[in-house]
Amino acid sequence: DRTIYEDANIFAPNLHAMGLMTNRDFSNYESLFELMERLVSPPDLLIYLRASIPTLVGQIHQRGRDFENTISIDYLSRLNERYEAWISTYTKGKLLIIDIDNLNIVDKPEDLGSVIDRIDAQIHGLF
């Protein structure tokens, strides 16, 4: 699931930059986010699944959701760039970045197991 941080740092700024959110609406959204951020604790561990555009496109096609079929490569690229910029400055808590270009956690239990092991190590430590 997405966090409130992604909406505020990636999706809303992207919509604003594309001219799909007015300055007033964007300002209101930022104010609401700042209020929410003071009331909600950050996650114990933020897991970022890093993927290239070809991987993202493949996953979208594999899911087969009608509403995702109209997503353009340009839009995906913009979001991916914003994700990379945001994640490089994330300081709210623990962060685990997993490159999923060469993983298949749906069909390969060993890939899923390695991801779970990495999550456990981040949350509970190595021992």
Predicted regions and their residues:
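A glycine- and Lys/Arg-enriched "phosphate-lid" helix/loop adjacent to the NTP-binding pocket
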Residues: 9-84
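Switch II (G3) loop of P-loop NTPases
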Residues: 1-4, 26
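Short beta-strand segments at enzyme active-site cores
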Residues: 1, 46-50, 96-97
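Conserved nucleotide-binding/hydrolysis micro-motifs of P-loop NTPases
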Residues: 4-6, 51-56, 102-105
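NTP-dependent small-molecule kinase module
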Residues: 57-70, 74-127
